[in-house]
């Protein structure tokens, strides 16, 4: 499908998500894999939210932030994966302009929110391990609520400016988006107008969000590691590290895939690579989080055991 003249995003007309072209057997395999992973993501994160709500021992700031992260993962994957699954069906990749813009806004807003939430969770672990006697007085329920709310507000505000700029772009020629959801980079490639401002603003916001959240996380864990090393007993060190190991694992996976995603030569020559790596952030990481927090967290495992036994 092609258009011979440039059209503004407000002009009616669909885009087509290319998804994952290839042999039918491969597409069926990917469809089933993504479907199973999506269902596991929803069920796993709902289970964590339910566990925290059902057990008073888990109703602390740490698990309040975890519930926010679990809710975010459900929303994040739901904003992306159902349409991705639709691209495997004939004409399933067709998406309206409004639908594409809406999906892009929510996917990237939720992505920014995750960076902020992970930074807040790192700060919470810093207080719990480095300042245990003052933790209860500092990390009050009110502060935890404000930090979580601030993460959501900052995440959804950060993408507003680039989304507005993208909405003003004109497109000509092909409207086939070489991705499995409405990403910014493929839209920039399709535009027939100057995209320098959009690229600069998008890069600036991504740089500030990633660098800011990463900075808070790194500083927090620098203090945490220093404090753990100073603990004289091996048992004490293990106990202290176990309180943050789950979060650290999630942070390493999330930032690791982010680094791979942004280390690339050019937008045009790396769309296929970007599409493959983005699967880590949008599909793989959300399904891993519930299992990481369940398998590596003693309190969550105990709450799950009590729930299964009906106690």
Curated annotation (Swiss-Prot):
Tissue distribution: Olfactory epithelium.
Gene3D superfamilies in the cross-refs: Rhodopsin 7-helix transmembrane proteins
Glycan-bearing residues: 8
Main subcellular location of this protein, as a coarse class: membrane
Transmembrane regions: 28-53, 61-82, 104-123, 143-161, 200-222, 240-263, 276-295
UniProt cross-references to CDD domains, sorted A to Z: 7tmA_OR
Extracellular side: 1-27, 83-103, 162-199, 264-275
A Pfam family the protein falls into: 7tm_4
Cytoplasmic face of the membrane: 54-60, 124-142, 223-239, 296-311
Entry's Gene Ontology cellular component terms: plasma membrane
Record-level Gene Ontology MF annotations: G protein-coupled receptor activity; olfactory receptor activity
Keyword line: Cell membrane, Disulfide bond, G-protein coupled receptor, Glycoprotein, Membrane, Olfaction, Receptor, Sensory transduction, Transducer, Transmembrane, Transmembrane helix
Subcellular location per the Swiss-Prot or TrEMBL entry: Cell membrane
Disulfide-bond pairs as recorded: 100-192
Topology within the bilayer: Multi-pass membrane protein
Homology family: Belongs to the G-protein coupled receptor 1 family.
Function: Odorant receptor.
The protein's name in its UniProt record: Olfactory receptor 287
Organism: Rattus norvegicus (Rat)
Native organism taxonomy: Eukaryota, Metazoa, Chordata, Craniata, Vertebrata
């Amino acid at each position: 499908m092609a258009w011979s003249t440039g059209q503004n995003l407000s002009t009616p007309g669909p885009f087509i998500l290319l998804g994952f072209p290839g042999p039918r057997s491969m597409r069926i395999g990917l469809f089933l894999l993504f479907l199973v992973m999506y269902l596991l993501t929803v069920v796993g994160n709902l289970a964590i939210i339910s566990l925290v709500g059902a057990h008073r021992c888990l109703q602390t700031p740490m698990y309040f932030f975890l519930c926010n992260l679990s809710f975010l993962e459900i929303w994040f994957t739901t904003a992306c994966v159902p349409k991705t699954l639709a691209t495997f069906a004939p004409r399933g990749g067709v998406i309206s302009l409004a639908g594409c813009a809406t999906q892009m806004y929510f996917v990237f807003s939720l992505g920014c929110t995750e960076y902020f939430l992970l930074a807040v969770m790192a700060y919470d672990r810093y207080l719990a391990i480095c300042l245990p006697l003052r933790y209860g007085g500092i990390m009050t329920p009110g502060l935890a609520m404000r930090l979580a709310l601030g993460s959501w507000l900052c995440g959804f505000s950060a993408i507003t400016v680039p989304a507005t700029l993208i909405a003003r772009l004109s497109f000509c020629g092909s409207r086939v988006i070489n991705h499995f959801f409405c990403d910014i980079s493929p839209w920039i490639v399709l535009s027939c107008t100057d995209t320098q401002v959009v690229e600069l603003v998008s890069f600036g916001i991504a740089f500030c969000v990633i660098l800011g959240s990463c900075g808070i996380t790194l500083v927090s864990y620098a203090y945490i590691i220093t404090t753990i090393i100073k603990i004289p007993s091996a048992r004490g060190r293990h106990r202290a590290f176990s309180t943050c190991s789950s979060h650290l694992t999630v942070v390493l996976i999330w930032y690791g895939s982010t680094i791979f995603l942004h280390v690339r030569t050019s937008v045009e020559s790396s769309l296929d690579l970007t599409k493959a790596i983005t699967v880590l952030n949008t599909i793989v990481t959300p399904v891993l989080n519930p299992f990481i927090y369940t398998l590596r967290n003693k309190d969550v495992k105990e709450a799950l055991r009590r729930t299964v036994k009906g106690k």
